[in-house]
Amino acid sequence: MIVSKSTNLSSSVSSWRRGKSTFFKTRTTTGNFSSSSKSSKISLNRRRSSRYKNTIKMENFESKPKPEGAPECTVYYTPELVSKAIAELTAESARSAIEERGYFALGLAGGSLIKMLSGLKKDTNEENKIEWEKWHVFWVDERCVPLDDPESNFGGAYETLFKDVPIPRENLHAIDDGLYEANEGASAKSAEAYDKELKSLSETILPKGDGGLPIFDLLLLGFGPDGHICSLFPNHSLVKVNDARWILPIADSPKPPPERITFSMPVVNMAKRKVFAAVGEGKAEMAKHILEDANKTDGSIPAAMVKDAEWLFDTTGSSKLTTTHVRFEFPGTPTLLGLDTKEED
């Protein structure tokens, strides 16, 4: 993990204490860092806790700017702080898009990401009040099941967030679950219908870019333990599809249910902002692989093919990173934009 500072730090920075354990302590502004070396002045220590395992102790670091072209990676102390950051960046993206053209186009994955947006329900700031009626929400993939099925990404998002906010139902762009009576054969019909619906929207709602591809303001993406995104799975033929279709059918998903629809990779990459969240120990190994080891073009790890993505981690989610440049955002400490990973002689 490489980190570098954005501000001048004093020779001694007060520790932010969580319980009795010192989380963050800086003694000097020069030195070396290696997350794997025993001789390092900075170490990532795993400690047993009923609520959280990892703490980070930092001493003696050397400033290093983010390399050109490196992904934006930010580490937060807890999952709750990652959730807060996700909600804030979503609200920020919405305000920017609405100011620019009057609408906000958001693409969502399923899983835990939608829970991170629940803080938006509490936004009562009148000055920056969320204009829900100007939001248009889409799903980057969907299972071909009824919308009230527990497996439905739309259903999960609606129950978790959208039923409690004043967003018009017609602005929630779900698949038409009336197109099929059984799962078999549903993906082709559903993908065609969803593709047609999205292409019929005005460019004020969903702008178009190169090749007529849609430009979503923000995609909130998850990734699986195999590195899949949306319903684009490793080494599947759909990963490299590059034609006029925005929405693709998949009838042989390696994860049940087999019938799904998904954004194509070109549609994902055309979005203005693409954001991944890697929270928890279960995400750490694959996040490292995506950012540091994976082939970016062969389709073996689809998440590695997403260009110019932003990454948000908690400390456990980032614990396997070794060469990735990261920025630390911790309450009670200066903002850090990375440290050099040179080992001591």
Regions found by a protein language model. Give the residues of each.
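N-terminal glycine-/serine-/threonine-rich phosphate-binding loop
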Residues: 57-106, 188
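Ligand-binding beta-strand-loop-alpha-helix segment within the catalytic cores
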Residues: 60-70, 129-217, 331-340, 344
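N-terminal organelle-targeting presequences
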Residues: 28-65, 72, 345
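Glycine-rich N-terminal segment of FAD-binding domains in flavoprotein oxidoreductases
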Residues: 98-127
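N-terminal chloroplast transit peptides
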Residues: 1-41
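Glycine-rich beta-strand-to-loop/alpha-helix junction loops that act as flexible
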Residues: 108-113, 221-225, 279
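ATP/nucleoside-binding phosphotransfer catalytic cores, i.e., glycine-rich phosphate-binding loops
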Residues: 266, 270-345
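Class I SAM-dependent methyltransferase SAM-binding "motif I" and its flanking Rossmann-like core
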Residues: 219-266
